[in-house]
């Protein structure tokens, strides 16, 4: 369910970012059109819930609560990401909160869902959740570096796309924080 949800977000993200490439291949909206990508993403979201509902009924309420919180967090993070493109006041802390929501919450939610399915203790699920947040932050920070300094053949998309799209990345927010008026 989490993987299907994640891929749904990528379909919609590619439209919002006008990214033509995903994993080295044409993005769905590029190969077909925006409508196909939106409807495919919507169907994937519904299918993710269908998969989730196949889990043990004893833990299903907890799973649904965690899945919904995860989905809302990811959507909030995506909205921040879009909003930041037209803002000049994005700080490193705001950027870190955006990637915590957009990327960290997804990984954290996946780990917590696994813990719930395994009937782990709540404190264990919370430790896994916090670990997922930190892995997500590290992943997104590394992704920012790859977008600037990576190899397009390895990265699976053109280098510099975030810069061209006006994305507020860690590199940009840090540069703006340390720059002075003369720079």
Could you say what each language-model-derived stretch is?
Residues 1-181:
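Mg2+-dependent prenyl diphosphate-binding active-site environment of isoprenoid biosynthetic enzymes
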